[in-house]
From Swiss-Prot:
GO terms for cellular component: large ribosomal subunit. Signal peptide: none annotated. Belongs to the universal ribosomal protein uL10 family. Part of the ribosomal stalk of the 50S ribosomal subunit. The N-terminus interacts with L11 and the large rRNA to form the base of the stalk. The C-terminus forms an elongated spine to which L12 dimers bind in a sequential fashion forming a multimeric L10(L12)X complex. This is Large ribosomal subunit protein uL10. It comes from the Bacteria.
Amino acid sequence: MALNIEDKKAVVEEVSAIIAEAGSMVAAEYRGLTVEQLTELRSKAREANVSVRVVKNTLVRRAVAGTKFEDMAETFSGPLIFAFSGEELGNAARVFKDFSKANEALVVKSLSIGEGVMDASQLAAIAALPTYDEALSKLLYVMKEPVAKVARGLVAIKEQKEAEAA
C-alpha cells in the first residue's frame, strides 16, 4: 500500500528521532526471510534494546541526511531492515550476527558506529565489542588488581617480620 506524503513525512520524522538517539546503525538485506523469522528477529532485537525498522530506502535516506549516518545512504539498495543501537554500540551488530548464523537469508550490507561506513566484513569485530557493563567490570578489575597485589605484598612482609621476631 502506497503512503501519502503526510504518512511519508511522519515516517521520516519517526526514523529521524530514532537516528538522533542511536549510537550505531546496521542495514541488512532480509530477502528470503519468512514473517516468523522477521518476528523472531524483532523479538531478539527488543530483548537487546535495539530498534528494528523496515522502511523504504528513500525515506531512510531522507532521515539520515545531515546525520552521522549520512554516508551509509549510498549502500541502501534492495529490501533492507535497519537496526539502531543506543548506548550499547555493539548490540545491533550482535543481534544481526547471531541471527544470521541460523538464517543465512539475512545479509548485512553496511554498518556504522558514529561517522564512517563499515562493510559486512567488520560485523564480527563490532559484535565482539564488550557491553557497557562488561567494559566497566574489566576496567574495575584492571584498577583493583595492582592495589590487591600491593596489599598482599604488605601482608607477606608483615608475616615475614613476625616470623623473624618469633
